C-alpha cells in the first residue's frame, strides 16, 4: 500500500452531527449555517475531512436515517443553497466533506414507498420487500433493531413489508436492478455537486438471504435474529456500485459493517476488491456488552486485555491489504471518555488525552466525533423524559414495560451507560445559555457540565484536551511511520497498553495506562536511552511508575 498512498489514508475525519452542532435560526436545532460558522474552528484543530450525518429531507423518526427525499435538504437544517455555501466554504479552506448515505432503507414517507403500497402490481412494489403472512403471523420471526417484529402489516394491500429498523424505515430490495440504478444515479448527482465521498450506513445489510428464512431465537424472546448481514450478493452489489459510480471519482468511502471480522473486512475493503476504501468495525465496542442476553444494555467495563487483542487483530489482519478506520465513539455510542476512560473530574482530561494517544498513532484513518476533542462526557440523564432516541425508548418499553426483565431503576442505569443520546447532546461551545448552541430550547437537553467543559475554555487553556488533539493530528501528518509502519503489540497480558509502530527507521512506541491507579511499567524495548518523547499527557516521567491514565509516545532511534 505504500506505493499508492491515497489522500484519505493520511487524513483525519471530524464527524458532525448537524442537529446538535450549532443552531443559527433560533429553533433549538442545529443547521448547515451553524456548521459553516465553525469551519475555522475545525481548520484550526487540523482535521482534513468533515463527515455529515444525514441532512436529507426526513420525517425524523430516526433522526434523519429515515429519508423521504435524497436530493432535498431537511428544512430543519436549511436549504440546498446553504449546503452549497457550506461545501464551497469547506473546500476554500482545504477541507473535504463526505455525506452519510442511507440506502438499506428509506422513510415510509418516501414517494416511492407511498406508491409501492398502493397496490400489488405497481412498478415500485418490488423496490421493497412485500410478503404475505402465515395466517395472522408475520412472514418470518425476525426482530427489528428497535424491537418487535421486523414486519409491519399494511391494510391496503393486506401484505407485510420488511423493516429491519423502525416501522417507518422500510427496507429496500437490492435484488431489483432498477432500484440499484436509481441509487447510483442519486449518488452520482451528489458527487457531481462536489462532495468528497460517502459513509454508508449498515451497508453490509443490503443483501438478504434468499427466501428470508427464520433466524435463531434470541434469549428471552419470541423473535429471532434478522438474517440480513453479509448476505450472498452484497459484494456483487458493492462491486457494481464501485464500477458504476465510485471508481469515477477521487473520493473516500467507508462502510458501516456490523458483525464483520478482519477476514470479512478484506472482502469489503481489500485493495484488490474494488468495493469500499475502509469499513467501520465494532468488535471493540461489543466487549462491554451484557453477558445475559441484553446486548448493548450493559454497565460492564471493557476488559483491557480483550481490547488490546481486538485492536491488534485488526491492525495486523489488515496491514498491507486493507485500511483501518479508527474511532472510539460516534453518534450511536456513549462518549469515549465515559466509556473507555474516566469522566470523573480528577481523571477526565488525562484519560481523554490517553485515549486519543492510543487511537491516533495506530494505522488507519482516525475519526473524531464532535466534542470528543473537548473531552465531552455522557449526559447521565436521570429521567426517561430526557431521552429522545428511538432505540433507547424502544428498549425501555421492551425490557421494562412489556417483558419486565429489568426494573425501571436498573434500565435507567443502563440507558445512562449506553444510550445513543449520550453522544447527541448539543455541542458545548461556551458558558452562555444552552452552552452557546442555541438561544432557544434545544431539541435535546444540554449536558449540565457545559460550564466546565466547553470550546471557549479549551481554546483558552494550552493544556486542554483540544490542544492535545491538535498536537496528535500534527504528529500524524508529520510522521510517515504512523501511516505506513507495521504494528506490534507489546506485553499482551499486562495491565497497560504498549505498542510499537514503524518500519525499522524512527519507529514510534506508545505506552498507555488505562487505569486510575499507579502501576509499574513493563520496560523492554521502550527503555531506549536515545528515545525522544513526542507527546505525553504528563509533564515529566516518573521512573518505574505509570500514573493514572498516563500516556507517552517515543520516537526510537
From Swiss-Prot:
Documented EC number(s): 3.2.1.20
Keywords of the record: Glycosidase, Hydrolase
One Gene Ontology biological process: oligosaccharide catabolic process
Catalytic residues (UniProt): 201, 256
Coiled-coil regions, chain positions: none
Leading EC class: hydrolase
Record-linked Gene3D superfamilies: Glycosidases, Golgi alpha-mannosidase II, Oligo-1,6-glucosidase, Domain 2
Site for Transition state stabilizer, residues: 332
SUPFAM superfamilies (UniProt xref): (Trans)glycosidases (SSF51445)
Reactions catalysed: Hydrolysis of terminal, non-reducing (1->4)-linked alpha-D-glucose residues with release of alpha-D-glucose
Single GO molecular function: alpha-amylase activity
NCBIfam families: PRK10933.1
Family: Belongs to the glycosyl hydrolase 13 family.
Protein name in the entry: Alpha-glucosidase
Origin species: Pediococcus pentosaceus
Classification of source organism: Bacteria, Bacillati, Bacillota, Bacilli, Lactobacillales
The encoding gene: agl
